[in-house]
Amino acid sequence: MSTQPMPLSLTDAKPGQGEYRVRAGSEIRALLRRFADEELPITLATPDGVSYTTCLWADDPERAVLVLSADAADARVQRLIEAEEAVAVGYLDSVKIQFDLNGLMLVHGRDASALHAQFPREIYRFQRRDGFRVRPVGHACPELQLRVSGPTDTELTLRVLDLSHGGLALFLPDDQPALPVGTSVRAARLALDPLTQVQVALRVVHVAPLKESAHGSRLGCEIEGLSGVASRTLQRYIDQTQKRRRLLAVS
């Protein structure tokens, strides 16, 4: 799943991309509302290579402001607000969403800091070609079972928030051991349902705090190793989940 932006200045987009441009205020609000409601990760990027993953905490079209989570101690946050250009990139199901960030500033609150940006006037949508990310349907959510090495080895069972053939997102409760960016897990067990389990190797590529009421963080992980059987099993689960979502949308 690539979080690399298309050409950083959206006005420089290639001919033919205009059909993916969203300018209607109601459509822009609907897209951003999904990022906030589903607590989906958004990667902020600059032309000189700064990349920072965050979540949209609030969108306020009346005040024309976006509010994104931020760690004030992270040097990348300061580089973002000092940059002349910045772009936000995220995914909604099979579509890459991208928009320019203007007026980016760091705001300090009593309990947390946040990034504020101007509400976007337009958003670009790019159809993904490298697979689909799905969120579990129903109450039986997939889980990842892994062992964390340390002074005392710890067994963790983490809920899967969404997954694709190339990666997955996990919910890490605040009271569990941290899994920082770069952590590699060579032998984890992905339980797709009570009867279906596959072995995976993965690496943590970003960590983003969720809303305070969630009491945890979202871990974005790349899948680095799948056997042929495991790959087919995972693809079958993704296909079945997509079909179930379409049926629920129609009913």
Curated annotation (Swiss-Prot):
GO annotation (BP), single: regulation of bacterial-type flagellum-dependent cell motility by regulation of motor speed
Function in brief: Acts as a flagellar brake, regulating swimming and swarming in a bis-(3'-5') cyclic diguanylic acid (c-di-GMP)-dependent manner. Binds 1 c-di-GMP dimer per subunit. Increasing levels of c-di-GMP lead to decreased motility.
UniProt-listed InterPro entries: PilZ_domain, Split_barrel_FMN-bd, T3SS_YcgR, T3SS_YcgR_PilZN
All residue ranges annotated as the PilZ domain in the record: 127-239
Disulfide bonds: none
One of the record's GO cellular component terms: bacterial-type flagellum basal body
Protein name: Flagellar brake protein YcgR
Subcellular location: Bacterial flagellum basal body
Underlying gene: ycgR
Assigned protein family: Belongs to the YcgR family.
Transmembrane helix is among the record's keywords: no
Subunit structure: Monomer. Interacts with the flagellar basal bodies.
HAMAP family recorded: YcgR
A GO molecular-function descriptor: cyclic-di-GMP binding
Keyword set includes Transport: no
